[in-house]
Structures are given as C-alpha cells and as structure tokens.
C-alpha cells in the first residue's frame, strides 16, 4: 500500500494525505460477523464525562475479529482484505474448510487466495498461527497471547511487529515494538509476520474535520484556561505554566511521570524495559 497526497484544491486538502487503499478488495463487511456499536461519547452510566475529548464521529459497525485463532488443524482461504473503522490495521475475511467464516488481522504480504493454518506443526508462513515453542528464533510475529487460550493481546496495531529472541525452559523472550524484552509462556499462540498497513503513521489529517469524523473532539491547552479550570491557567497574556512540572487538570504530575506500578505482578516477566519516549 502507498500514500495518496492531495493537491491544495481547498485549505482542507492542503498537506492532506491518506492511504490509497489499493489492496482493499471489499467495501461491505460480512453481515454475520458484524454487530451494532453505540458510542458512549466518553460518558458513564450517569452521563458524567469520564474520558474527555470524545463525541460525535461517523456511525460504525463493529467487526468481530478472531484473536484466538482456535480453528486448529483446519485450513482457511483468504477471501477479502477489508477496511475496519474500529482499528488502524486492515482485516481479512477467511473461509475455513468446515464452512465457517472469520475475520483476522491482515498480515503484511498476504494475498487473496492464500491458505492459512493454526496448528502445532504449521509451516512458518505469513498468517499461520503456532505456539511459541514451534517458532524459530528471529521470526517476526504479531497477535501474541499473554495467557494460553485468552487470545492475542500484544502487537495488534498497524505496522507493528515483534521478534522471538531467546528460549529458556517454559519461557520465550520476545522483543516488543517498544523495545521492551518480555518473557511469555511458550504455550501461548502467536501469528507469523507483521501487521499490515505500516504506512498508517505517515498519513497527515490535513484538517480538523478528519479528527471529528473519528469521534475525537478538540483539546484545549491548560495554559489557555483560567486558574479555576486548570493548574496551568491564568497569567497576563502568554505566560509559562508557573509550576515546577506539568500537571493534569486535577493536579497530578504528568508528562514524564512514570505511571506503571512498582509492585505490578508482571514486572518479573520484563527482562529489559521499553525505550524512553517509545
């Protein structure tokens, strides 16, 4: 896939670029694998804002994605490659030999008509799913389970890829896209290859309306508010925040403040911490 760059026909198309969607083969999703999706607009059951800057956006249908890949030993054929408005990666519709249809994440390089398999002895081919015990060192993987049978939880965003770097006993060392090296139980499943649509980060929205289509509302800077509304607010004209460090609207330190718990149970599985600012 490539990037389509608009000419400056209007102020909104100046500096605007989007994916060219050349590998998208189907416009309408499989009806049996979709369901309605109601936007909460950042509100809880009482109507109180619990997540700011959310609301509006285009209506969406939720596509049910098979992150578990539990069709063990049954071959599937890739029928379509589709756009999914609920994630930045694309998805594939797979028809299995037993007649069942399922959506999976689109692995980069897979084509319509390719055959995929989830099995203990599947070949190391893009789109196949195997336990970490069967995956050789240095292999690129995505959609990695943290607990056997729970479904892939790691490395699912567009263009992301992890790598198997070591094996010892019941554990496999995985280098994640953030640079973190983490131990994962060897019976967990992972899919071979890189997640598709790697050019996603190269797109330029070009206008504010593009964000509104996504259901994202404007973010007002704290320094532009009054002191009653934000710790950074107030002052005559354009001034500094007037604090030793940046704070959230509720007065907690932010931007550089570590938020991971020092006593989190999974800290023992982290061999090397992620890179700074990743």
Curated annotation (Swiss-Prot):
GO biological process, one term: mitochondrial translation
Location within or outside the cell: Plastid, Chloroplast
Keyword Nuclease attributed: no
Cited Pfam families: Ribosomal_L2, Ribosomal_L2_C
Record-annotated membrane-spanning stretches: none
Ribosomal protein among keywords: yes
Biased composition (Basic residues): 209-220
Keywords: Chloroplast, Plastid, Ribonucleoprotein, Ribosomal protein
InterPro entries the record matches: NA-bd_OB-fold (IPR012340), Rib_uL2_dom2 (IPR014722), Ribosomal_uL2 (IPR002171), Ribosomal_uL2_bac/org-type (IPR005880), Ribosomal_uL2_C (IPR022669), Ribosomal_uL2_CS (IPR022671), Ribosomal_uL2_dom3 (IPR014726), Ribosomal_uL2_RNA-bd_dom (IPR022666)
GO molecular function terms noted in the UniProt entry: rRNA binding; structural constituent of ribosome; transferase activity
Top-level division of the source organism's lineage: Eukaryota
GO cellular component, one term: mitochondrial large ribosomal subunit
Region (Disordered): 32-56, 203-256
Family, similarity comment: Belongs to the universal ribosomal protein uL2 family.
Alphabetical list of PANTHER family matching this protein: LARGE RIBOSOMAL SUBUNIT PROTEIN UL2M (PTHR13691:SF5), RIBOSOMAL PROTEIN L2 (PTHR13691)
Record note on quaternary structure: Part of the 50S ribosomal subunit.
Protein name, UniProt field: Large ribosomal subunit protein uL2c
Gene: rpl2
